[in-house]
Amino acid sequence: MGFGLESIKSISGGWGAAARSCDACKSVTAAVFCRVDSAFLCIACDTRIHSFTRHERVWVCEVCEQAPAAVTCKADAAALCVSCDADIHSANPLASRHERVPVETFFDSAETAVAKISASSTFGILGSSTTVDLTAVPVMADDLGLCPWLLPNDFNEPAKIEIGTENMKGSSDFMFSDFDRLIDFEFPNSFNHHQNNAGGDSLVPVQTKTEPLPLTNNDHCFDIDFCRSKLSAFTYPSQSVSHSVSTSSIEYGVVPDGNTNNSVNRSTITSSTTGGDHQASSMDREARVLRYREKRKNRKFEKTIRYASRKAYAESRPRIKGRFAKRTETENDDIFLSHVYASAAHAQYGVVPTF
C-alpha cells in the first residue's frame, strides 16, 4: 500500500514553501505546466487558453507543487517531479522498489483530462449510471492464481452490470459474489461434521470424526490419533479417538476442551504405573540377596601360598628388626660357608657337597 499524499509531504522539511501560483491569474495555485509556453496555469486558465490550441502539457508535482511532474508512482498514486521522486524513493529500500512510469502528457483541456481520469477510476464511475462490460478485459485463470478446471462454465459468459448510485447502495459485495463459489468447495464424502462448542476463545479448523469401517472382529483393533497431545491415547483403547481436519478451507470452530469422553484419568494412570514399578524393584532386590547368600556359602578362608619360590627367597634374606636389609660381600661369604658346614655335618666323610 502506498503512502498518502499528506504523509509524503511530511517526509522532508524542504517542501514547506508555498505552492506555485498561476502565471495567468496570479491568484490560484497552478495545476498544469505547458511545455510550449513554459507557463504554470490553473485549471480555469488552462481551459480558457488551450481550448483551441492543443499544446503538450503535464501535471504539476503533487508534493512540492513547484515543478512539473516527471514520473507517476503507482504505489503512492502521485505525480512527482525529479527532485521529489529522488527524495521520497531513496528514503528506504521498500520505497525504492515502488513501480514508477514516466508521466503521461495530454493535449486536451485540463477539465477534459480530469473528467477522463475520474471516469476511468473505480470511484469515478460510481457517481454515473453507466453499463460496464466485465468481458471487455479477458480474465485469465493465471491472473486469478487458479487452475482452469476450478472456474465454473458460467464465468466465460458475457456479464454486464448496470452500475449507478441507485444500484450500488446496500450492495458492497457486488464484485465478489461470483467468487464465493470458488472458495466454497463441497466434496461428497462420508465425514460427519460435528462442531465442538467447548467455550474456547481461539478459532481452529473443526475436528471431524470418521466413521469406522465394517470389521468382523474389533477386539484387537485400536484407532490411534497422532494429533492428540496426550500420550495416554496410544496405551488405552477407546471406541473412536481419531480426528481429522475439515476439508473445507473456510470452516472454523472453537478449540475443543480437554475434558472429553475419550480422555483417560491421569491419576489412574499414575497410580498403576507407580505400583508396577514398586513390584519390579522388590523382585530385583530379592534376587540380589539370594545371589549374595550363595557367594557367602562358597567362600573359603584357608591360607594358600601362591608363589613358593618367593617365600623361600624371602626366608633366606637378611633381616634387621624384622625388615629386609642389603647384603654385603662379607655376609655373602658367611652365608656360603654356613651352608657348606651345615651340609658337611650331615653328609658322609670324603664326599664333596654339591649345591
UniProtKB/Swiss-Prot annotation:
Keywords tagged on the record: Metal-binding, Nucleus, Repeat, Zinc, Zinc-finger
InterPro entries: CCT_domain (IPR010402), CONSTANS-like (IPR045281), CONSTANS-like_Bbox1 (IPR049808), Znf_B-box (IPR000315)
Highest taxon listed in the record's lineage: Eukaryota
Zinc finger intervals, B box-type: 22-60, 61-103
GO biological process, one term: regulation of DNA-templated transcription
Ligand binding (Zn(2+) 1): C22, C25, C45, H50
Primary localization class, coarse: nucleus
Compartment(s) of residence: Nucleus
GO function terms (MF aspect): DNA-binding transcription factor activity; transcription cis-regulatory region binding; zinc ion binding
Binding site for Zn(2+) 2: C61, C64, C84, H89
CDD domains: Bbox1_BBX-like
GO cellular component: nucleus
Family the UniProt entry places it in: Belongs to the CONSTANS family.
Protein name: Zinc finger protein CONSTANS-LIKE 5
Originating organism: Arabidopsis thaliana (Mouse-ear cress)
